[in-house]
């Protein structure tokens, strides 16, 4: 019968696409058996009450551990099972290798553009303002020649594209300057591994130094990346804003930047990321 023949045919209206992001901090805490910390954070935020220094330090240690482990389920599962950081790093290196294999398939028709872009993400974020500079790839490189490769990385959710807006208005997309952008890693734990990838292995003390903020690397870019990751997982498109401002007593305008802009209830919410110990 017709009914029998069409049983397994999926009609487009019945198909729903679900975007799968790396585990966020709340999901990570659940995986570790912690059902208290996130609720305490939410309650403190809603009531605008501080948690206290001791509790804050404990939460920040958990958050830093989450940053370096990352939100990839296999890496989180290894952490929960008590694997060493070196073993977790090995898992993340394998994930990066799988990403590179996927990019290589795309690059058969695009002259390795996506692979090169992906490999330069840590170096790009190391820049003073984190803006993506094509000159780090090729001094003659131009945005229009690489736009498809950047879009592929973002659509594959390997990276998160953050676009400059010329005006901080509610309809952010209307003022998007796509040629001026930042490119974050989709998972911050993978960014940490990518930064350390030139080492044959990542030692335990290296990871512990990251967790306790005792490692002399640009922690700012790691913090920016984790905020971008969390905003994206919460359903926000990523935008930032540059503007000129003349401070009191100054003769010349100076350039300033708002790290992220989010829209909530028809209002713009500026987000500034700081990596200090407090």
Placement of each model-derived feature along the sequence:
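Conserved Walker B catalytic segment
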Residues: 1
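Interdomain motor-coupling "hinge/lid" segment immediately C-terminal to the ATP-binding subdomain
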Residues: 4-126
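Short, solvent-exposed loop/helix junctions and linker helices
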Residues: 22, 111, 140-143, 217, ...
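A generic structural signal for short
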Residues: 50-52, 137-138, 215-216
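Non-catalytic, well-ordered alpha-helical scaffold segments
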Residues: 57-61, 66-73, 111-115, 144-147, ...
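A short, surface-exposed helix-loop junction/capping segment
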Residues: 96-101, 126-135, 202-215
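C-terminal accessory/connector segments of nucleic-acid motor ATPases
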Residues: 110-121, 126-166
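A cross-kingdom feature that marks ATP-driven nucleic-acid transaction machinery
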Residues: 148, 154-158, 162-278
